[in-house]
Amino acid sequence: MAPPEPLTALSRWYLYAIHGYFCEVMFTAAWDFVVNYNWKFPGVTSVWALFIYGTSILIVEKMYLYLKDKCNILIRCLIYTLWTYIWEFSTGLILRQFNACPWDYSQFDFDFMGLITLEYAIPWFCASFIMEQLVIRNTLRLRFDEHAEPGSPVMSTVSMANGHVKCN
C-alpha cells in the first residue's frame, strides 16, 4: 500500500485561510478589549481575509521551505513581517479601488495611506513566528490517506512514538 499523500496546495491554502480568519477575529476582539475595555470581545473581519491570509501564508510556506536552512528564525520572521506589510498594502490598495478594503489605519500615528501601520510591526513579527513554528510546519506534516475508512484510526499500520508518526 502506498504511503499517505501530503496535503495538496489547495488543502493547505484552505487551512491557512481558516487559521488567518480565526486569528483576525481573535486579534480584533483582544484589541477592542485593550483599547475600549469591551468585555463582549466583538471580533470582526471580512470574507476577503480568507483569500488574503490563505494566499499570504501559502507564499510564506514557500519562503520557509527555501529559507529554513539558509538563515535563522529571527531573520526569517523579519522577512515574513516585511512580506506581510507588502501583501497587506497591495491587497488593501486593490480592494480600496472597489471601496472594499475592510481596514483603515489612518487613525494610527505611523500609518501609510491608511493601509499599513508600523504599530503592528511587533504583533506581525510574533504572528510570523507562530505561523512558521506551529501552523506551517505542522500543516506540512499532515497526510491524506485516501484508503482510510472515515472515523477509523490507522494505528494498525502506524504507531505513535514521542508524538511522531512511525511506520511499523
Curated annotation (Swiss-Prot):
Signal sequence region: none
Residues that span the membrane, as ranges: 15-35, 41-61, 73-93, 110-130
Organism domain of life: Eukaryota
A single GO cellular-component term on record: membrane
Residues on Cytoplasmic side: 1-14, 62-72, 131-168
Residue intervals annotated with topology Extracellular: 36-40, 94-109
Subcellular localization, as worded in the UniProt entry: Membrane
Membrane-related topology note: Multi-pass membrane protein
A Pfam family hit: ABC_trans_CmpB
Record keywords: Membrane, Transmembrane, Transmembrane helix
Record-linked InterPro entries: CmpB_TMEM229
Segments forming a coiled coil: none
Protein family according to the UniProt entry: Belongs to the TMEM229 family.
Entry protein name: Transmembrane protein 229b
Protein species of origin: Xenopus tropicalis
Underlying gene: tmem229b
